[in-house]
Amino acid sequence: YEICNEPNGNVTWNYNVKPYAETVIPVIRANTNAIILVGSPTWSQDLHEAAKNPINAENIMYTCHFYAGTHTDWLRQRIADCGLPVFVSEWGTSAADGNGGVYLDEAQRWIDFMNERGISWANWSLCDKNESSAALLNGANVNDGISEDELTESGKFVFKNF
């Protein structure tokens, strides 16, 4: 379960996200083995706020979202410093808007960082939309599976790193 996906705007950890999570978690616990992923403010990047006042429950992980063309060393340091179990539930090889080219060097830094720390991840996005972060070429036919010749530069990088 991922609750509070990318909270943003005037949302705070202490007054919005954490109280909501503490209300929803007991309901989810009907499935006693469920891992619950909780986002933090600023599009799941304020892990330092969650670290100051973590949720007191079992099987909780905190999500982080990043884009290689926008989020660099400062966010990696924030993750390293937070001391929380982290799952990267969204990341892309592009800038945060999904475009701006593919930043393979920075994406590799992120892959290395996550691998060194045993951080699991999900990439954005498995689609054929005409944007840098898309894994599939525009018009790709995926009815019979995905072939390498239907992958974008981003898609090839991501699939290589699974």
Task: Describe the role of every protein-language-model region.
Residues 4-120, 124-128, 133-160:
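Extracellular glycoside hydrolase catalytic/binding regions
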